[in-house]
């Protein structure tokens, strides 16, 4: 039996053969065809050979990001992203304009809703941080809105005449010939002399039109496609007609009571508590139908629950002039003594009264921003008032014939119906009042005007008169872009139903209607102080008052009576010094304000005597 020789001098030791590593199979898309591809092909990072070079020592102050033991979130980098560094795209090219698109400052300010000039000096740190976060969110929202405004492709148009041409002399036939076919189809006349005169109302989307004739004719139609929705005869006089929150419900003020119809002409409700109604207005965000009557009552009907919210006795006789302020939902009523009163369902007395004319008020209209109010009276005066707290007339014009109907467009155009003539005045823009010097457009109708309204989101003016209905083209009257989530003219039936549910959930209570809606978000300081005073009287002490200083007990004879009194006096002196320093700063600020010269004033040589007299406590007139 042979044995293996032992390793010795002549026999080399036996070694194990190294096993060849199995290569990972490569796919056809991972194959390397050229040396360049091999050099640039992605693969696992190669380990660098260690060299004898030592790494530079790390400074002790260097921050090392460590993973938290309590949170699974990765550590957040405190450094802001550097937008200035060029970013590389998928194609390998560098972006020449890195970062987000800069928003124009003017557009961002237009969308900002927070006034940063008002600060809370003595607010808590938690409250201050919440305010700062809200301001940052509001600023970000305004910047995004300014960037999104670039997507609004539609722009408002306007009618511009040739050199020396008066636009008031341009006829409707000339405008129809100059515009496209789709816009020309929006101008039409309805000859309905047998049932006139007519009142009219457009829906909030601007797609549907409701007509109500004095002799009982009621009709609703899609005026864009000329498709008739319903047509009935109520067999009694119709005084006014108005759509509710959607085109599916229609309110008709008939001779005796108020009726509600659907879009098929079926009578749904007869509201007998609203009798002898003369005018109708609907508040869309509150779901309130405001009615005025011959008996002098202003009634608010909640159409969501079918109940009367309030019935106010105006004590001014017959009410036939009413308008709504779209900004704050306040109702404006015109009276026979020349005054206009402002009403809210939360108050039984008028919020304000404005003396506008020497005679009775015939018509009232308020623009879409709630800034300007136009009135016309029996004295043939047309006036525009400023509603921003002053209620002062800005401009006035004497008309050859008193205007019986007024209306504002979405972009601030003012129309007045005088007999069978319609005059339109335009201003410098939406935020400026219309100029009453020269009319923008003029049109003569086949009958006396009985109702006026601009169509939302369309450059169209609807006029109801004794001969029927006329649709006029008014360039630059409406907003070119609409909010698809609020008023969408192209919405389907399902979208309308979804919008109704959301609108009912976001319904604003009637008690919140006031002149200044922004006051709802402010702090009621008077009520807060009154509650604090009542709390102090009830408890017998002020729980929020600062506690008296109580020195801590010390050892080794430092808590003697003299030491305690000395420490208390030191704290009292410090508080007294702070109060004196604060009062001196207030006096210096007041003195600077008193000595500040008005803009445009020149310094005088006698000003030095005025300063000395004020410092000495004397009263000297400059």
From Swiss-Prot:
Keyword match Cytoplasm: no
Location in or out of the cell: Nucleus, Nucleolus
GO CC, one annotated term: nucleolus
Extent of Basic and acidic residues compositional bias: 106-118, 571-582
Sorted UniProt keywords: Nucleus, Phosphoprotein, Repeat, WD repeat
Subunit structure, as described in the record: Part of the small subunit (SSU) processome, composed of more than 70 proteins and the RNA chaperone small nucleolar RNA (snoRNA) U3. Interacts with DDX21, NCL, NOP2 and EBNA1BP2.
Protein name: WD repeat-containing protein 46
Taxonomic source organism: Mus musculus (Mouse)
Phylogenetic classification of the source organism: Eukaryota, Metazoa, Chordata, Craniata, Vertebrata
Gene: Wdr46
